[in-house]
């Protein structure tokens, strides 16, 4: 499947439709185990930025964990089906040198709102996160860099200094 500008915009639009509603439900329904799983994915993202590693796979675990935490079987199945597409979207949005470090606090804001059981804040934070990813994708598209293949393995980040708080 070829990645076109239109395809990526459609995918971001789908994310704006599904993820904020899923995160809203997660803020109401997440179990302690759900939160621990999402925290672990977040920690993996932070580790990848600070010490190098696979940011994108942890990013995918984070988002899929949030959708699993909504405890809606249809949303969970959709999340599984979209996994490869989301991974590719994350590969593109994190291909900017400062992309992962910029998006990490936005992820934290979503997670903190879910932990606080604040559905409105969780939904707003999710929309901000998706808007940031959309901006990153638009900048990558404008740069005319080669887009990753859907079949390519996740890129690994090099260590970044200093550590992120």
Predicted segments with their positions:
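Short linear motifs at protein or domain termini
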Residues: 1-24, 144-147, 151, 155-165
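Short coil/turn linker and secondary-structure boundary residues
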Residues: 3-6, 30, 98
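Conserved amphipathic alpha-helical segments that form helical-bundle/coiled-coil interaction surfaces
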Residues: 11-92, 103-112, 121-136
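C-terminal-biased regions
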Residues: 99, 105-112, 123-165
């Amino acid at each position: 499947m070829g990645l076109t500008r239109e395809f990526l915009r459609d995918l971001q639009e789908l994310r704006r439709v599904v993820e904020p509603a899923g995160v809203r439900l997660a803020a109401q329904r997440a179990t302690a185990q759900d939160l621990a799983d999402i925290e672990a994915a977040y920690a993996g993202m932070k580790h990848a930025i600070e010490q190098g590693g696979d940011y994108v796979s942890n990013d995918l675990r984070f988002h899929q964990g949030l959708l699993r935490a909504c405890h809606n079987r249809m949303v969970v199945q959709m999340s599984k089906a979209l996994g490869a597409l989301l991974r590719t979207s994350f590969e593109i949005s994190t291909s900017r040198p400062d992309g992962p470090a910029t998006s990490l606090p936005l992820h934290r804001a979503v997670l903190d709102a879910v932990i606080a059981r604040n559905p409105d804040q969780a939904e707003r934070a999710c929309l901000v996160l998706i808007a940031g990813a959309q901006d990153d994708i638009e900048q990558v598209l404008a740069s005319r860099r080669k887009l990753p293949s859907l079949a390519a393995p996740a890129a690994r980040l090099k260590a970044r200094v200093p550590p992120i708080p």
